[in-house]
Amino acid sequence: MHKVLHGFLMVAAVAILAGCAGIPKGVTPVKNFDTQRYLGDWYEIARLEHSFEKGLSDITANYSLRDDGGMRVLNRGYDAKKGEWRVAEGKAYPMEGPNTGYFKVSFFGPFYGSYVIFDLDKTDYGYSFVTGADKSYLWLLSRTPRVPDEVLSKFIKKANQLGFDTDKLIYVKHK
């Protein structure tokens, strides 16, 4: 009985972790993705709320290459209540090859989640629409702290069409 229970728990754990690195239904990662052009600083413009970003302003992400072929992810946000910056460092690896905007990302040991780029300004990589493993994760990232109205409108329209709850978007303040 103990072996059966242990086996079940192992299968359940693998299934749960596998689900954390999936793609939401209806979402397609961008193709012809260029990791080199994606590197550098990004500003978080809008998002759906999650505990790890709750109450933060001035949120940025920096992507750089790792020696093992992955990307280093450095997220920062300012916690005004505590008067301090919160920083999280992670790593990301391509899930469908280097030319698709779909990565597994980890900020904690062997546990990975999804990072799915479903729209991207392919001319100059000026903005990026990103989700996670399910539709409770949604971000609009930009190379600048503000985006033109047409980019924000495109983001909201596309996210709505894909089934994201854009009424719950939080717009990030940048100084």
Question: What positions do the PLM features span?
Answer:
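Bacterial Sec-type N-terminal signal peptides, specifically the leucine/valine-rich hydrophobic h-region
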Residues: 14-17
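Bacterial N-terminal signal peptides that target proteins for export
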Residues: 1-9
